[in-house]
């Protein structure tokens, strides 16, 4: 009885301390559920979960950086700022419409996975993928233990997505939130589900948020996993061997690779690329996006400012789409040459898109038609990327 009494007292003290901690959290106000965040020197971003009382707390996973910086969380009528550091979380409350309390957590903690295997203390983890006919990095995995499902690794995505039509219950997705999702065509309000479990081979991720897009025509369902899954790792994409290799450090041998500076931001991962239009060279920062089905796309404002089309041949028009029903018309021009580090690629088609296609601070997107020709090492923590030509290098970038 003494042991039971002692445990009861300890539990009571713990519960009381948790309640007091929640009571002492800072409070801001909101009249609307949409929010914005300014993370360090980056522009204010709007692609975040809506405030809700259904999920406690609502976790906002901000940039996983090794740099401390100031971060401000905005509602429509109020704001709160924190000096954030790597591997930390910051809690507060939002009083919504003067009556509902939303519990909020800003997190710079890494999205780590666990290993469900014996003697798996290796320095790296290897994932086999299939490079599909539609040029997608496709991995076999599972969602909420509901059976095998295709997972597409999209380096341009910062979140996980499920795309299907009326399939949320089949795959164990509990729809309990909304978010503003940003794609090449702008912002759209989508449904979200939390928590979820994803598994690839012996690697398991718990407490994952998934954005659910109920798209007509997608009867089988599929998952898109973003860079958020591997943000704490060095990621090697080997198209020759169809392997993803995850490690904590750069490989010992990176001979033959060219090093390229990168910017990993709240809006994505960007690499510096040089375009030669026949008259001059222009440098810009492009989103590193294995989920984009083209070679290059460019923000219309960046093109206009640098007169990039001047001297380049228009070879057609096209569409850039985030879904079958959500797209933008674009002009397609041909760049005589582009450079990525020491690697030169000839006759690269560029889609010239609209103003709202990307964060205006950046030039555009480099897609899979170029990236598939280059084995890649992404060092997220140290902001460097490494490229090496592979067996697909030299394939024409022009669509047949």
Question: What residue spans do the PLM features occupy?
Answer:
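Pepsin/retropepsin-fold aspartyl endopeptidases
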Residues: 20-400
